[in-house]
A protein has these predicted regions:
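Conserved PLP phosphate-binding loop immediately N-terminal to the Schiff-base lysine helix
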Residues: 18-31, 45-80
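Single conserved hydrophobic/aromatic residue that forms the stacking wall/gate
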Residues: 1-11
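Structural motif of enzymes handling amino- and sulfur-group chemistry
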Residues: 125-146, 150, 154
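Active-site PLP attachment segment
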Residues: 70-114, 127-132
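Surface-exposed amphipathic alpha-helices with a cationic face
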Residues: 34-42
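Conserved PLP-dependent catalytic core of the aminotransferase class-I/II
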Residues: 145-187
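Helix C-cap/helix->beta junction micro-motif
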Residues: 43-44, 169
Length: 187
């Protein structure tokens, strides 16, 4: 990506990826990679979009997986304190039982963007009052039951258990990795 041609004659408007690739083999990106994407997006007037359909809503031990890549969360990596991997747009769904898009202020730089007016074109049945009430209740429960922190604590236990299996069976279990409850290993 860093050596790619990002000149103005290349028609790129967005960088879209999952902060942790689920269907792509459970690939956990390094902090530096995610922050470099933010730099590339900023330097080339490109929107950085995270697909948090599988990784969002607390499963990784943070409300959004991309929050693991913020400068304050990456103090153990080589990124500077002022670096960040913040997205311009987040897509989410599954755990909320509604599909959604969270949009940052950078979208306002785009003339006549689709978020200026309310629309239901992004989902056949989405956006109903029932959906909004259900989502509100889910978010209240997540906060009340402290589910994000509990996912972080339980995930730490799970990952440590996988590390123990990896140590006990090195020819069978390898590449233990995870954030919160979003853990994996190779067989």
């Amino acid at each position: 990506i860093v050596t790619g041609d990002w000149s103005s004659d290349v028609c790129s408007s967005d960088l879209i990826l999952e902060p942790i690739q689920g269907e792509g083999g459970d690939n956990h990106f390094r902090c530096e990679f995610m922050q470099e994407l933010r730099t590339i997006a900023d330097e080339n007037d490109i929107m950085l979009i995270y697909d948090e359909v599988q990784t969002g809503i607390g499963v990784t031990g943070k409300m959004w997986a991309h929050q693991h890549f913020a400068a304050h969360a990456c103090s153990d990596c080589c990124c500077g304190e002022d670096s960040s991997a913040r997205p311009d747009i987040i897509s989410f769904g599954k755990k909320t039982q509604v599909c959604g898009i969270a949009v940052g202020k950078r979208v306002e730089e785009v003339e006549k963007h689709v978020f200026e007016e309310s629309s239901r074109l992004n989902s056949t049945w989405g956006g109903s009052l029932v959906d909004m009430v259900r989502l509100t209740i889910y978010l209240e429960l997540i906060e009340k039951e402290n589910l994000v922190e509990r996912a972080n604590e339980t995930g730490s236990y799970l990952l440590n258990s996988i590390y123990a299996l990896q140590e006990e069976y090195p020819n069978l279990v390898s590449n233990a990795r995870g954030r919160g409850l979003y853990c994996a290993f190779d067989l």
